[in-house]
Amino acid sequence: MFSLISLSHEESAESANKYVWRVSLWVESERQTPPSEVFLPFFRVEYMKVRKVSIVVLVLTLFIIPVIIPPAHSSINTSTTYATAYVGETSISSEPFILDVANLPWLNPQGSNIRFFEYSNLTGQLYAYEQLFSKTTWTVNTVESTGWETLPYWQNGQLVFNCPSAPHGGQYIAWRYTPSSNTFNVTIHITSWPSGINNPYSPGIAIYSPTVGDQPTDIGTSGFLALLVTFNGQIWYHETNGNWVELSVVYPTPSTAYPFTFTVTFTENSAGNVTVSTVYINSTAYTVNVNTPFPWSQIGYVGIRGDIDNLFYVSYFAVSPSPFVNSVESTDWKTLPYWQNGELVINGTGASAGGQYIAWRFTPSSNTFNVTIHITSWPSGISGGTYPGIEIFSPNVGNQPYAQASGFLALLVTFNGNIWYHGISGISGCDLLKSSAYPTPSTAYPFTFTVTFTENSAGNVTVSTVYINSTAHTVNLNTPFPWSQIGYIGITSCYDLFYVSYFAVSPSPFVNSVESTDWKTLPYWQNGQLVFNVTGASGSQYIAWRYTPVGNTINVTIHITSFPSGIPSGDNPGIEIFSPNVGDQPYDEVSGFLSLLVAFNGNIWYHGLNGFVLLKSSAFPTPSTAYPFTFTVTFTENSAGNVTVSTVYINSTAYTLNFNTPFPWSQIGYIGIRGDPSNLFYVSYFSTTQQLYAYELVTNPYTNTPYTGTVYMAIFPYPISYDVYVSQAPIVYSQATLPLVTVSSPSQVTTQYPIISTSTYMVIPSIGAYSGNTPLFLYPQMAVSEGIVPVIPMVESTSWKTLPYWQNGQLVLDVAAACSSQYVAWRYTPSSNTMNVTIHITSYPSGIQYNPGISIYSPNIGDQPYDYASGFLALLVTFSGNIWYHGTNANWVELRSSAYPTPSTAYPFTFTVTFTENSAGNVTISTVYINSTAYTLNVNTPFPWSQIGYVAIRVDTQNLFYVSYFSISQGSSPFVLVSPSYAQGFVGSQYAYPYFMNTTTVLVNNTAVPKGLSVFSGYMPGANTVFSTFLYMNTTPQSPVLVLMPAPYVSFNALSNGFSITADAQILSLYGYPATYTNPSFTYTPPGIIGMSGTNTFTFKGAQTQLSASTTPPSSTTPTPPSSSSSSSSSSSISTSPNTIQVVLNGSVYVHVPLLFHPALSTPNGSVLFSTSVNSTGVYISSYVTSAITTPLNVTIEYTNGTVIKSFTIEPGQTFQVPLVNGDENVIISYGNHTVTIPISANNVNVLSLRNAISAVLPPIYALPLFLLFAGSFFISLAVRSVPKFAGMGSIIYIFFVAPFLIVIGIPTSVVYGTVVGALIIIIIGLWASRSQD
């Protein structure tokens, strides 16, 4: 077997970039026996008998050896079925949870197309969608200075930079960036700058070299390069020695009295350095052309720099030409489209030409689609001679200077009534197809503009209808634009300035599933809220979403922020349930469907097939519309199979109704919002929650047929709370093949439609299943696209009246009338002896009541009704200055009161607690920071440091507050738990491993995985995380199983028909677990993440890492596998050491795998070029496909004395197996001036390990005789080694019995072949010696 056993970093002044791995080969030999004494025994036999036997043995060997050698891997069939199963937090005794689908598709890796939600309960059918407005997906940072007093934080969707009194100037936050061309633009939009730009300080946009890291400040620190373009007109260069040099002062300072946009264009000059080409301030261009000494090749990070006495708010920061807002866009904008207050600002003023556009990829799935835009403001007005509007482009449009360029097709429907066709020839081919086809909307007010496009009989596009504020204008204009050439849908500007709050394409209703048709103003989005305006409508209007309950209870919640019209007497706005056949009616008083209305004014109505009947009036009070209110209705299924209106909650006050209705539970098809003709109200939150067994991905809700085309999927780990419709960007039906997943039992899920993939890259949703209230499966990890990405697990108390929810990018925590002591907590285990927990609260309407604050819990907290239950540990640091400890007996003990002042809730505040480990191994509360003011406490507590399992926000009775940021940090990079958006930077990167599985073969990273154990390591630069994955392919025929274990500890037993694991694990299999493997039992703990900054973690200079508590074997409280499969895998047999993952296989064969902090060759800008893997067939090197590789990697294999064995090159994406030789060897891989050496040597395997390995693949009745034959052959050889006349018999035993099984247990065939050849030579020598003596 092979094993990676150690990791060393050998650096010297001569070779500072060489990182060395050591790979060891375990072969069977005797360490103490001199080579001259290693002879196989043979017995005295007559010459002719020996010769006959030898001939027979030689013939049999020719047949037997090829049979026992594994065959070459066959080609891969990409159309085979595929399934996944996941390990749960509790022992599992039922059948495994299986998602039975075909090959899963490639997932668009942009984080904007995946939504993750982390709160209890799952609501409704989940729609796949694509966000046309992807915005900028923020991560908190890649590198960041460490001298901030208040770290940058999110508030109202803006990143706040606060440097009022930092101990050092020059604080920065920067994101990883490597330009792909010789020009790029950096744009920042600053909405507010209360402090003004204070001179002589220098905030601005900065670029840094890859070596910057997390410095205390960028002033006076050495070892990196920087280039700073300040907001006050200066350009500075930072040398590696730490000195800043001023290069120029060339443009004015923008006024901070108003919001401003600041863009810098950087270009590469002929010397290979950076030129600051142009600065744009609010679209005014200032030509700079300042050449700098900063090498273009050294651009590694782009960031924002703050300085002393500067406070400003950033709503937008992006680098282009990398895609950041759109799919394609024109290139002659003076001001690129940007986000401001939740709207896309289209500013074409000052452009060098009209026809500036921004467009998104779209391919229609039917012969009709609608494009809708809602414009909230148009300061410039629509000029008669211009042509802004909605435009369709062919797929080859790309990024042109303007929409009139040549080489593509376009169809423009302008806002001022004109329709234009653009042929291939560009301007000369633009034809006005129709003028004044409809009136121009007034720009004095917001307006909605919708165009319906249809495919005509000639296969071209017809502009069918234009709607302006819901007024239809029939056009029916046939155009020459081919329907098959629709590739992009976009917005075109012509020297205009306007603000867009909504833009979407829909092949079916675009905001909802069904809605009434007599609106005067269709519902639209404004400032993140759905505006429900029924004024002027001819009847009661509704908007409803497809929903079918899986359980027998559902909760429907709406949060109304404003109700200007009030609820007039006689009106009945409210929450309404519809039957599946409701469709798009003029209003809900028509006949032919069922509905149930729970009105805000206390009335309950039932709509039979012929109309409404009042079932109950004044069932509960009417909420006051003078203030925002939350309204929740709980519906249950009664014994008659009908709907019961169980409870209504108004602002968390419960009103028990238990009112039975005639509406059949089985007829629930849509859930919606209803308004009467005089109503106007604003909705910020609307959702349906329930306990589900699994989840659903829905296709077309009308025809129940799958879409075709590009696949996008919304993936939701369980349990979640899904705010289905509150989205600042539009939710659009995907052009995709999607399955409708239905639940057939609590542990079995099947899909109605297959998902076909043309790629071997996979996406595996993270899924959970529930039986009653008992979680069977909950795995907080998701393999997306090519690799494994961690998702933070969470626990939450269960007595909330209003569960925590998101509103305007903030987490709303409301315990106004709930049971006290509620919490929401995230899994966290510290890897050092210090951690900081920070919360930023933007608003606290209730004031601080009782004991809300930051708390830490032991790992066994789980989902309790409240945190004064028993059985776990807790430590609470309240906002009001008190510190409490909770022992396992449920008693809270106050450790300190009034330890620090209570922050004022009249303003937003930041609250940080520093926890440290004291000499007793317990937690000390070291310091509390309130708005950057430090209060030293040093309060020792009885809470053991090793018991930190969750970090939480605790809420007490009568508290309501809004959280925009919550994070944990142990160094310079915070681990953000609550943030306005969350990007999975690892998804789709070249650092993940692609894998493929069919019934006979498993490929990982283009390498065939043999039966038995294999090890792969990966590195995620953006998250500073090492991913090490163990893969075990089951020995049962036709049932391959991969076990992905990211944790640095695993105890592993190989069984004849399955396996037993005690580890973090994810099971991937074609058929779930092997059918013959009954009573599976797994122990699950959340993944351990190894940080990469600080004094006790990996650095690029080889500092050792001490494994944290999360990397040690599970404690005695963790469930263990059944005794039949765990007898040889106890934690006592495992010893841990720094930098090492340890595996116990069959009790005594140890596999040691180093935690590779940078498991591959890297370029100067940090791009990883290759990785290593090892398994029972050998050592493999895999070259990544990355833009950083421009030439092949050079590989040299040589003996340790320097003699070259082989030299060759490998292209990106190739995997090669290292050829093994007799003796030690080095594999040297180089790229440019960077080199990695991988030495390979031979070690020994002990006899006990061999016996255990043999026993794992044979029944005991055969394994024992085999072991005795193996041992006996060497015993006989030792006893009669001096009698050469009795040659051959020991060799015959070895060839016939021992060699085949050495191959079976994983000894490389090349090694076994060598010993077989040696044995044959000994037989021949024996025969010759016998003849000579005779």
UniProtKB/Swiss-Prot annotation:
Sequence intervals crossing the membrane: 53-73, 1256-1276, 1292-1312, 1313-1333
Alphabetical keyword list: Host membrane, Membrane, Transmembrane, Transmembrane helix
Bias (Low complexity): 1110-1135
Compartments where located: Host membrane
Membrane topology: Multi-pass membrane protein
Main localization category: host cell
Region (Disordered): 1107-1135
Cellular component aspect of the GO annotation: host cell membrane; membrane
Top-level taxon in the UniProt lineage: Viruses
Protein name: Putative transmembrane protein ORF1334
Lineage of producing organism: Viruses, Viruses incertae sedis, Bicaudaviridae, Bicaudavirus
